Amino acid sequence: MNITRIVCTGVLLLAASAAAQDGGKVIQKTTISLGTATPGGGFPLYGNAFAEVMNDADSTFSILPRNTKGSTENIPLLEAGQLDIALVAGEPAYEAFAGIGRPRTSLKILTAMYSSPGMFVVRADSPYKTIRDLVGKPVAFGARGSGLPILSRYMLDGLGLKQDEDFQSIYLDRAGDGPAMVLDGRVAALWGAGIGWPGFAAVAGSAGGARFIAPDAGEIARIKAKQTFLKPLTVPAGSYPNQNGQIDTLGSWSFILARADLDDGVAYRLARTLHGVESAFCRKLAQACETTAANTVVAAPGSELIQAGVLSYFREIGVAK
């Protein structure tokens, strides 16, 4: 979706009079645009569920998810004021906050979404068992514009591997295209991240089953030594069909970021509402079980990066100082 189309879709963060009545009073609705990613991936799944639970919990909100190209488009759209809030993977967020390859961003964190443990999935009948086995093979590294190829690039760099030189790297136009490419043999492996990630679930749930490939303990240590911002993460046993043991790997936290000038009062209300629906959100979507106020404080690189209205609410409930 290009910027022009997004601008034409509607004015952002509108306070509009709703038809609903509350004791004879017109309810003022705050409309909030939420950028997600391409269809078929984890971000639209999460974003749609987020909007549903938030809108159900607070009738004054109208959160509207929109498909975009993903993290690398969401950041400039937020900075241009053409989205109110958006889902952003950990690596693009890290680069934006640190000013790597670009000026430092003034965007702020609304909430941590979930941790994103990175790994590959292959067919169970494939001969590939290690990352080195995939060198020279066709690998789908995720959708163009998403954070997944950035995470894989950092991890492979920690092992001395170049994503576009040591692999036949393929970037998808739609995140949902990856599983079929693994299953029909067009690619040897699909890179992804997360617990309950749709691409992994599709391959693991297929008739032939799947095997996951993650860095071993020595490789994790090598990657961590070079990419210090990546965190050791675990995919618990049973996260995917026929996954009998836990998988240790590395990854990062994805965030919902807010445009720099998002009203502090609106952000405070969003944080308060989200805190109130943490359990309901978890029941609706497994990935959302990590979307908590406490995890946001832990996952944020610094409290100064948390939106001021959100931080004010966190201090009120005692999860932040």
Please place each PLM-identified region on the residue numbering.
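N-terminal (or domain-start) structured segment
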Residues: 21-89
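Short, solvent-exposed loop/turn segments at the edges of secondary structure
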Residues: 113-117, 250-251
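Bilobed "Venus flytrap"/periplasmic-binding protein-like clamshell domains
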Residues: 31-57, 61, 115-184, 279, ...
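Short beta-strand-centered segments that line the small-molecule binding cleft or hinge
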Residues: 105-114
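Pocket-lining segment of extracytoplasmic ligand-binding domains
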Residues: 90-92, 100-101, 126, 163-262
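Hydrophobic h-region of N-terminal signal peptides that target proteins for export
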Residues: 11-20
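Bacterial N-terminal signal peptides that target proteins for export
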Residues: 1-8
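An extracytoplasmic/periplasmic, membrane-proximal ligand-sensing/linker region
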Residues: 177, 183-185, 194-212, 222-229, ...
